[in-house]
Amino acid sequence: MINKFTLSRAQNVRYVKEHLETLIQNNLALSRYELDDPLRAVAKQNFEEAYNFILNNPDVENDYRCLMYLHEVLMKNLNSDVKSELNEQKIEELSMMINQPTRANLEIAIDVLLYILDKRLFADGDVRAALLFANKFMIDNGCGILTVSQDKKDIFREKLKKYKEDKDYDIKNWVYMYCVKGPKLDY
């Protein structure tokens, strides 16, 4: 699997800023916030804060502490009972997955996304946290952005279910084909 985009962090940040509203709307739809949901405004504000953190903190390491922080931001004022901690084994697995210099950054980001979703590291908000954590890695490495468009959310959920039940890795290629976005660059 190769990177679809080779951008500077600044180019990647600019792309995200230009498409932020669409990205947030996709995130809200994937997180099952309908237009009439009273918590939608809170969730939207949390996504905005999380993206702001990602875009403005390039020096924050992509590690379990960053993942936990993003989850905390995304769940703020939504479900205060959700407390999550990663055990040493999961911290080590996540670290090993992120630190693979021989693999394309895009593939690492997709694998991290799927790992977080498969292991259900959070009682609630795992899709949100997984997607934004993978996107921090993508943005920091100039690989574009991962987003599941609203017209593809049901297919994503179906493929994710198959992945969790049967370890069907078709989802990895599907995410690569349909969920990686970035600018069209003129050379």
What are these regions (language model features)?
Residues M1-Y187:
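FIC/Doc superfamily catalytic core
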